[in-house]
C-alpha cells in the first residue's frame, strides 16, 4: 500500500512523463508486488513513439530510393535530349539544300502556267490536324499542353464552320483520342523512340493522299517546338499547301526562317549538371540564279516536293522528341529537388522525436534512481 502511494506521489510530481511509462519504470525499480497477468503480445510491447520512429525511418528510406530513381531518369533524359538535338542539327544541311533547289526551280516556273498540286491553294472546307504527342509520361505538362492546343484549334475550326479530321502521332495522343469517339480521327500512328524517315514517311503518305484526293483542303501540323532545355512551346504550322520558298508558316500565313538552332553542351560544374548554350546556324549552299536541268523542271519538282514534305515532318517529330526529353529532364530535376527537401524535413522530425525519446528514458532512469534513495 505504501509502495502504491509512493508511486502515485512520484508520478504526480513529474508531469512531463506519461502515467503509463512512469508507473511501469517505478514499479520495476521498487519491486512492488503486482497482480500477474498474461504476458503482453509483441505488438503491444512497442510504444507509439517507437512505432512512429520506425514509420519515419521507413518513409525516409522510401524517399531516398525515389530520389535515386529520379536522378537516374534525369541523367538518362539529359543524354537522350542531346542526341535528339544533334539529330535535328545534322539533318539541317540536307533540308536547307533541298529548300534552295526547290526555290530556284519554283522561280524558273513562275512565268509558266504550271499546276503543282502540293503548292496549290484552294478554298478551305475541311482541315486535317496532325497532332504529335509523346509516347511516355513523367514529363511534366508536355503532353497536356499540345492536347490543349489541339482542343483549342478544334474549337476554333468549329466556330468557323469548317470540318476537320485528326491524325494522331504518339501513344499519349492515341489513348486520348480513343477515349473521345466524338472527335473524328483518320489514323493512329506511333512516332517511335527515335524518329526516322520511315516514321515520317508514314505520316507524309497519309496527309499526301488526303490532300491530293481533295478530301482535305489544308493540313496543319501541331507539335512542340524545341526552343531550349528549359523552354518549349506548342505550335501550329501549315504543312500543306507547301510554301514555295521553303519557309515554315503558321495558320495565319506568317512565315519564319527555321534555319537557326540553339546548340548546347551538357557539362558539370561544381558537381552539378549545367548547360553551355550557343546559337548554331547551318551554312547553306549558294546556287547560281541560272540552273540547267536535264529533266523537265516540273518532273523534278514533283519528285522533290514529297521529299521536302517528309523532311518537314521528320524535323517536327525530332523537335517534339527533344522537347519531351527536355521536359522529362526538368520534371525529374524538380522531383529530385523536392525529394531532397522532403528527406531533410523528415530527418529533422525523426531526430527531434528520437532525441525526445532518449531524453524521456534518461528522466525515467534518474527518477527511478532518486526513488530508491
Swiss-Prot record:
One of its GO terms (cellular component) is cytosol. It is found in: Plastid, Chloroplast thylakoid membrane. Induction: By light. The keyword Phosphoprotein applies. InterPro entries: ATP_synth_F1_ATPase_gsu, ATP_synth_F1_gsu, ATP_synth_F1_gsu_CS. GO terms for molecular function: enzyme regulator activity; proton-transporting ATP synthase activity, rotational mechanism. Transmembrane segments: none annotated. Residues 1-50 form a transit peptide. One of its GO terms (biological process) is proton motive force-driven ATP synthesis. The active site is at residue 139. The modification Phosphoserine is found at residue 347. It is a peripheral membrane protein. Disulfide bonds join 249-255. Keywords: ATP synthesis, CF(1), Chloroplast, Disulfide bond, Hydrogen ion transport, Ion transport, Membrane, Phosphoprotein, Plastid, Thylakoid, Transit peptide, Transport. Its main location: plastid. NCBIfam families: ATPsyn_F1gamma, PRK05621.1-2. Produces ATP from ADP in the presence of a proton gradient across the membrane. The gamma chain is believed to be important in regulating ATPase activity and the flow of protons through the CF(0) complex. F-type ATPases have 2 components, CF(1) - the catalytic core - and CF(0) - the membrane proton channel. CF(1) has five subunits: alpha(3), beta(3), gamma(1), delta(1), epsilon(1). CF(0) has four main subunits: a, b, b' and c. Interacts with PAB. Belongs to the ATPase gamma chain family. This is ATP synthase gamma chain 1, chloroplastic. It comes from Arabidopsis thaliana (Mouse-ear cress).
Amino acid at each position: 500500500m505504501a509502495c502504491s502511494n509512493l508511486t502515485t506521489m512520484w508520478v504526480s510530481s513529474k508531469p512531463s512523463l506519461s502515467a503509463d511509462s512512469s508507473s511501469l519504470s517505478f514499479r520495476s525499480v521498487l519491486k512492488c508486488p503486482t497482480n500477474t497477468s498474461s504476458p503482453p503480445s509483441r505488438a503491444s510491447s512497442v510504444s507509439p513513439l517507437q512505432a512512429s520512429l520506425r514509420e519515419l525511418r521507413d518513409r525516409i528510406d522510401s524517399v531516398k530510393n525515389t530520389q535515386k530513381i529520379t536522378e537516374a531518369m534525369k541523367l538518362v533524359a539529359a543524354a537522350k535530349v542531346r542526341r535528339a538535338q544533334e539529330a535535328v542539327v545534322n539533318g539541317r544541311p540536307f533540308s536547307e539544300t533541298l529548300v534552295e533547289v526547290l526555290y530556284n526551280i519554283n522561280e524558273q516556273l513562275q512565268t509558266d502556267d504550271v499546276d503543282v498540286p502540293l503548292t496549290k491553294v484552294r478554298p478551305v472546307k475541311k482541315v486535317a490536324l496532325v497532332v504529335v504527342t509523346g509516347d511516355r509520361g513523367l514529363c511534366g505538362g508536355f503532353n497536356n499542353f499540345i492536347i490543349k492546343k489541339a482542343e483549342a484549334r478544334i474549337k476554333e475550326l468549329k466556330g468557323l464552320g469548317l470540318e476537320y479530321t485528326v491524325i494522331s502521332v504518339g501513344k499519349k495522343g492515341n489513348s486520348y483520342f480513343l477515349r473521345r469517339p466524338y472527335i473524328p480521327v483518320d489514323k493512329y500512328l506511333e512516332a517511335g523512340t527515335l524518329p526516322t524517315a520511315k516514321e515520317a514517311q508514314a505520316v507524309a503518305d497519309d496527309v499526301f493522299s488526303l490532300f491530293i484526293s481533295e478530301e482535305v483542303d489544308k493540313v496543319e501540323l501541331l507539335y512542340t517546338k524545341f526552343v531550349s532545355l528549359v523552354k518549349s512551346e506548342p505550335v501550329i504550322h501549315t504543312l500543306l499547301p507547301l510554301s514555295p520558298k521553303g519557309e515554315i508558316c503558321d495558320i495565319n500565313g506568317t512565315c519564319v526562317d527555321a534555319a537557326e538552332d540553339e546548340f548546347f553542351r551538357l557539362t558539370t560544374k561544381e558537381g552539378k549538371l549545367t548547360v553551355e548554350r550557343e546559337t548554331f546556324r547551318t551554312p547553306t549552299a549558294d546556287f547560281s540564279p541560272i540552273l540547267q536541268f536535264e529533266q523537265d523542271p516540273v518532273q523534278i519538282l514533283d519528285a522533290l516536293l514529297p521529299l521536302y514534305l517528309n523532311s518537314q515532318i521528320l524535323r517536327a517529330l525530332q523537335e517534339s522528341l527533344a522537347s519531351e526529353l527536355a521536359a522529362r529532364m526538368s520534371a525529374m530535376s524538380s522531383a529530385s529537388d523536392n525529394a531532397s527537401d522532403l528527406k531533410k524535413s523528415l530527418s529533422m522530425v525523426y531526430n527531434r522525436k528520437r532525441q525526445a525519446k532518449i531524453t524521456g528514458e534518461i528522466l525515467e532512469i534518474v527518477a527511478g534512481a532518486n526513488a530508491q534513495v
